Amino acid sequence: MRVLRVDASARVDDSVTRRLADLMLEILGERVPDLSVVRREAAGMPFVDDAWVGANSTDPEARDSAQRWALAKSDELVSEVMAADVLVIATPIYNFGVPASLKAWVDQVARARLTFRDTEYGPEGLLTGKKAYVLVASGGTEVGSDIDFATPWLEFVLGFLGITDVEVIAADRGMLRGDSARQNAAEHVADVLERDWPALAEAS
């Protein structure tokens, strides 16, 4: 089984979402002997710029060396997503949405003709057959509430790319709920993996 883990928290040593991702991969590692994990930090992710847009709009066979260089990081990120059976996206909610670094990662992997394509019936996602776990933490925003713009957007954009099997596990309102938010989320991780294990085992 090939897992792509994307960490978006600005915190490194005291991150709730990183701990949840660690737990998820620990449980998977106990069950999957040949588990392969690629870790990707969203921090420092390059933003789409004019050179990127021009290169991406150029036919691949017609791109010059500068254009290929402009898309090199994006190509690497796309390859990681395409190779993964399971995505683990660990993200806090900042100011009601996802961190800018995670949005930048999405912009780098949402590539026409690679991860989605336009058809006469509308856009079609090409990253089908994958499972995504979105591990979310927040200080005060309740996941699923009217002020949560992070998880609905992630579910939508993943579905747009063809990843429609998305599970959200939330340790939300941590400032109000304290340790109970983290404990409940950890238990949810274990329960979800137990439930999903038959399908995950088949994928592995």
Curated annotation (Swiss-Prot):
The enzyme's E.C. designation: 1.6.5.-, 1.7.1.17
Leading EC class: oxidoreductase
Cofactor: FMN
Molecular function terms from GO: electron transfer activity; FMN binding; oxidoreductase activity, acting on NAD(P)H as acceptor; oxidoreductase activity, acting on NAD(P)H, quinone or similar compound as acceptor
Signal peptide residue numbers: none
Keywords: Flavoprotein, FMN, NAD, Oxidoreductase
InterPro entries attached to this UniProt entry: Flavodoxin_fold (IPR003680), Flavoprotein-like_sf (IPR029039), FMN-dep_NADH:Q_OxRdtase_AzoR1 (IPR050104), NADH:quinone_OxRdtase_FMN_depd (IPR023048)
Family annotation (Gene3D superfamilies): 3.40.50.360
Annotated FMN binding sites: 9
Record note on cofactor: Binds 1 FMN per subunit.
Reaction catalysed by this enzyme: 2 a quinone + NADH + H(+) = 2 a 1,4-benzosemiquinone + NAD(+); N,N-dimethyl-1,4-phenylenediamine + anthranilate + 2 NAD(+) = 2-(4-dimethylaminophenyl)diazenylbenzoate + 2 NADH + 2 H(+)
Family, similarity comment: Belongs to the azoreductase type 1 family.
PANTHER family to which the protein is assigned, alphabetical: FMN-DEPENDENT NADH-AZOREDUCTASE 1, FMN-DEPENDENT NADH:QUINONE OXIDOREDUCTASE
Quaternary structure (record): Homodimer.
Entry function: Quinone reductase that provides resistance to thiol-specific stress caused by electrophilic quinones. Also exhibits azoreductase activity. Catalyzes the reductive cleavage of the azo bond in aromatic azo compounds to the corresponding amines.
Listed name of the protein: FMN-dependent NADH:quinone oxidoreductase
Organism taxonomic ancestry: Bacteria, Pseudomonadati, Pseudomonadota, Betaproteobacteria, Nitrosomonadales
UniProt gene name: azoR
